[in-house]
């Protein structure tokens, strides 16, 4: 889908045009029975790339509506030449998750939470979730994980016993990557030792110390994707859209594409 074929439809509002600028609504209208769309069926597009009218971004990996049918995966050869099946599968499940009412932190939109082992987490979208048995999991978090209080982290506990099947990669005091079982002690503050007292670390890199929760995605999933209808005498509520900021440049920096 080159950008010239997916211009924004004129009949939609300004807010929606900014996020549906790829023309998905028009493509769906031409190729998908409206009765199915209005009765809970989903609709997705495998695209090469799209141009966001608001930012001009061309190499986003996709876009999805939150709690409403409609998403697109755009990891095509123009910007994502060499993208493997892991990238395609992870991005597909990520964008579908938005339709199923999931956000980047599951129940919230705090991204990058290390113990949130879900492809909704940008950390795991392109690569899958590393498991202790050497495999990678492409899916949603299926159990509650311990809450991490960034201002008082217990290094001895790691991510707790629930994280025993997962791996965690972090930097050591010399800046080298260390991969270890996530339920073992973790040197969060990178001082070379496991501290006995709580430490304060911004684990998800958002610049603030926060309480990072990671509840099971199964508690948040909503399979009723029927589009919102207009209220009495009111306009149709516009769906919230999530343009994916993970780009081909990010994949290239990770060594995932040439």
Question: What are these language model-derived features?
Answer:
Residues 1-117, 121-126, 170-185, 197-200, ...:
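Active-site-proximal segment of zinc-dependent metalloprotease catalytic domains
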